[in-house]
From Swiss-Prot:
Pfam families: Peptidase_C15. Keywords: Cytoplasm, Hydrolase, Protease, Thiol protease. It comes from Enterobacter sp. (strain 638). This is Pyrrolidone-carboxylate peptidase. The lineage of its organism: Bacteria, Pseudomonadati, Pseudomonadota, Gammaproteobacteria, Enterobacterales. GO terms for molecular function: pyroglutamyl-peptidase activity.
Length: 214
């Protein structure tokens, strides 16, 4: 049986939970066609997160790899378009590291684009009534670190698709952040199930508007 690898993160930035792992861990063992979903929790740590991700990719040789992270303040599921080759941490990671303007891969390309059918994934979520959009930036913290590193890792594996999805706070988190948007666990889970199915079955992306003016 083939594998789909899905990762989430441990809590960071003073939070007691991370919605990415709270939802991703519920996907463990799910099957789509002939693929089984395997989940892994990554530390919110520069370097170490990629070491663990790369080990999981080598172990499982997955068909699809999707990393999921928290984007508190975003209102919808955001499928990332691009990871850039820079760490520029506004806050320290969970080991106290705070790299500023440091290349993730020295001498690597400036950016890697997602190899997922990102617009088709967004369209499929919207068809089910789930707010979703394409995002043009994964930030410059550990989420972008993982996205860029993932895409660099699979760059020569033409049979592997990979990318990153950001999700909003869960309601229990938003209660501590006045005015912050949130999304229910079951809605996020449904969105990720849709994303995995489309990523596995769709060989190429659709031609649809997904850009931004700023």
């Amino acid at each position: 049986m083939r594998h789909i690898l899905v990762t989430g993160f441990e809590p960071f930035g003073g939070e007691t939970l991370n919605p990415s792992w709270e939802v991703v861990k519920q996907l463990e063992g799910m099957t789509i066609d002939d693929c089984r979903v395997v989940t892994r929790q990554l530390p919110c740590v520069f370097g170490e997160s990629l070491t663990l991700l790369n080990s999981a990719i080598d172990e499982l040789n997955p068909t699809v790899v999707i990393a999921v992270g928290q984007a508190g303040g975003r209102v919808d599921i955001t499928v990332e378009r691009v990871g850039i080759n820079v760490d520029d941490a506004r806050i320290p990671d969970n080991r106290g590291q705070q790299p500023i303007d440091v290349a993730i891969v020295p001498d690597g390309p400036a950016a890697w684009f997602s190899s997922l059918p990102i617009k088709a994934m967004v369209a499929a979520m919207r068809e089910k009534g789930i707010p979703a959009s394409v995002s043009q930036t994964a930030g410059t913290f550990v989420c972008n670190h993982v996205m860029y590193g993932l895409l660099h890792k699979i760059r020569e594996r033409t049979n592997v698709k990979g990318g990153f999805i950001h999700i909003p706070y869960l309601p229990e988190q938003a209660a501590a952040h006045a005015g912050a948007p949130s999304m229910a666990t079951q809605t996020v889970k449904a969105a990720l199930e849709i994303a995995l199915t489309v990523a596995l079955r769709q060989s190429s992306d659709i031609n649809a508007v997904g850009g931004a003016t700023h």
